[in-house]
C-alpha cells in the first residue's frame, strides 16, 4: 500500500466547496493508500467526530496546522487579497511539518491537493527524492470578456485585470514555475487549466475534475411527462453566474409552458434587479423564486424537475452540476470551464461561449427543443447513470492511485 503525504488546507466532512472536495478525495483514496494529511485546524472537531466510524479511517492520519479566526474569515471572504500573505506562511509551516513527517515515516508520494488555485503551489516540491504530485490545478480560466458588455465599470476592470494577471503569473511567477517543473505529475481540473499549462509552461497534465459524483438510486422517468416544463437554476446572484442571461433566455423561448425555478439569492440590489428584469421581460408568472434552501431541499427538487439550467461563464468544476448528474437530471450549460469536461450530448446539451445575445438565442432554442422532445430528456436522464460511475469519487480515487503507481 502506497504511503501518501497530502497537503489539504481546507478539509472537512459534510461540506461542499474546497473542504468537501478535499475530504471526498481523501476518504476515497484511503481505501487504497495510507494517507498522512496536513490540514488547517478549523474543521478538526468534525474530522475527529467521523473518523473512528470509517472503515478506512485507520489509513487516514491528520496533522493540524491551525490559523487564527481572523485569518479564517479572510479565507472565506472571497476577494480578500490579505489572505494570501498568511496562506503562504501557512504553506511554509506545512512544508516544515512535512519534512519532519518524512524523516520519521516512509512516504512514497507528496501530493499538493488543495486549495486548487494555481497561484499557491505550496512548498512540498522542495522536499528531495520523493515524487511530487500537484493537482487538480484550477483558477486558470479566462473570463470571457464579450459577456462584460452590460457589466459596471468596476466589474469590467476587475475581470479584465484578473485575466491579464492570470496569464502573467502562470508565465512568470517563479515559485509556480518551479513547482510545475519539479512535479512528477500534474493534474488539471478543467481543459482550460490543461491548455494554459501546456501553452505557457510547455508541460503535459492529466485532466481530472476536482469534484465528483455520488451514485444514486433509479428514479422514475414520469417527471419528464408533465405538461409544465420546469428548468432549475441554482446559485448566487453574482455576475459570473449570469442569472439575467437565464431570464432573457426564458423570455426568448416565448413558451409559457416553461417555468424557471430559481434557487439561491444575492444582496438586496441583486434580488431587486433580477425581479425587476423578470417583470420587464413579462415573465413574472414563469419564474419561481425559492431563495436559499438547505441542500436536501435542492436535491429533492432536482429529482422532480426536467432540466438543470446552468448559465455560469466562469467556473472550475461546479459541485452543483455534478449533483444534477447524481440526481439523473439532464444539464443545459455552456461548453466551457469545468462543464466542458463533464457534460456531453449523452447527459444534456451545451452551447458555445460567443456573446450574450447569441447565447440567449441558443439556450432558448435548446429549452424549446427539450420541452417538445421529452423522450430526449428521458434518454439523457438514463445516460446519467453511466456518467455517474465515470465521475464517481470511487472511480477518481482509482484513477489517481493508478497515476501514483506510474509516478
What are the residue ranges of the model-derived segments?
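A conserved mid-protein helix/loop that constitutes part of the nucleotide-sugar donor-binding site
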Residues: 20, 229, 238-252
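Donor nucleotide-sugar binding/catalytic pocket of nucleotide-sugar-dependent glycosyltransferases
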Residues: 60-64, 134, 165-220
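Short alpha-helical donor nucleotide-sugar binding micro-motif in glycosyltransferases
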Residues: 180, 292, 300-305
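Glycosyltransferase donor-sugar binding loop
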Residues: 234, 259-274, 291
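Nucleotide-activated donor-binding/catalytic signature segment of Leloir-type glycosyltransferases, i.e.
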Residues: 272-293
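Aromatic "clamp/platform" in nucleotide-sugar-dependent glycosyltransferases that forms part
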Residues: 313
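Short hydrophobic beta-strand element within catalytic cores of glycosyltransferases
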Residues: 330-333
Amino acid at each position: 500500500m502506497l504511503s501518501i503525504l497530502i497537503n489539504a488546507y481546507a478539509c472537512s466532512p459534510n461540506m461542499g466547496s474546497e473542504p468537501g472536495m478535499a475530504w471526498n478525495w481523501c476518504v476515497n483514496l484511503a481505501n487504497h493508500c495510507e494517507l498522512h494529511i496536513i490540514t488547517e485546524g478549523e474543521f478538526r472537531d468534525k474530522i475527529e467526530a467521523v473518523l473512528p466510524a470509517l472503515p478506512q479511517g485507520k489509513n487516514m492520519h491528520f496533522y493540524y496546522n491551525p490559523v487564527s479566526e481572523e485569518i479564517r474569515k479572510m479565507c472565506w471572504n472571497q476577494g480578500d487579497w490579505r489572505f494570501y500573505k498568511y496562506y503562504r506562511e501557512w504553506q511554509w509551516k506545512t512544508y516544515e511539518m512535512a519534512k519532519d513527517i518524512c524523516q520519521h515515516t516512509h512516504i512514497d508520494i507528496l501530493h499538493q491537493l488543495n486549495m486548487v488555485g494555481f497561484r499557491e503551489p505550496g512548498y512540498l516540491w522542495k522536499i528531495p527524492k520523493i515524487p511530487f504530485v500537484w493537482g487538480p490545478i484550477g483558477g486558470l480560466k479566462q473570463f470571457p470578456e464579450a459577456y462584460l458588455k452590460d457589466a459596471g465599470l468596476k466589474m469590467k476592470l476587475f475581470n479584465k485585470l484578473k485575466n491579464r494577471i492570470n496569464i502573467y503569473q502562470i508565465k512568470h511567477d517563479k515559485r509556480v514555475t518551479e513547482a510545475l517543473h519539479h512535479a512528477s505529475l500534474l493534474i488539471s481540473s478543467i481543459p482550460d487549466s490543461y491548455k494554459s499549462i501546456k501553452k505557457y509552461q510547455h508541460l503535459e497534465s492529466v485532466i481530472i475534475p476536482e469534484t465528483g459524483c455520488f451514485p444514486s438510486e433509479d428514479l422514475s422517468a414520469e417527471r419528464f411527462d408533465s405538461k409544465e416544463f420546469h428548468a432549475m437554476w441554482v446559485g448566487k446572484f453574482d455576475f459570473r453566474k449570469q442569472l439575467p442571461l437565464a431570464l432573457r433566455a426564458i423570455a426568448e423561448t416565448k413558451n409559457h409552458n416553461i417555468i424557471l425555478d430559481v434557487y439561491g439569492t444575492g444582496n438586496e440590489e441583486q434580488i431587486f434587479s433580477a425581479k425587476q428584469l423578470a417583470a420587464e421581460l413579462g415573465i413574472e408568472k414563469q419564474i419561481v423564486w425559492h431563495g436559499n434552501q438547505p441542500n436536501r431541499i435542492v436535491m429533492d427538487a432536482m429529482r422532480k424537475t426536467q432540466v438543470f439550467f446552468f448559465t455560469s461563464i466562469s467556473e472550475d468544476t461546479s459541485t452543483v452540476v455534478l449533483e444534477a448528474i447524481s440526481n439523473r437530471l439532464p444539464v443545459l450549460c455552456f461548453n466551457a470551464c469545468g462543464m466542458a469536461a463533464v457534460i456531453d450530448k449523452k447527459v444534456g446539451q451545451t452551447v458555445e461561449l460567443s456573446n450574450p445575445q447569441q447565447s440567449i438565442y441558443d439556450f432558448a432554442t435548446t429549452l424549446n427543443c427539450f420541452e417538445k422532445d421529452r423522450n430526449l430528456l428521458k434518454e439523457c436522464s438514463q445516460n446519467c447513470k453511466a456518467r455517474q460511475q465515470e465521475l464517481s469519487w470511487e472511480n477518481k480515487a482509482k484513477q489517481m492511485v493508478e497515476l501514483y503507481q506510474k509516478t
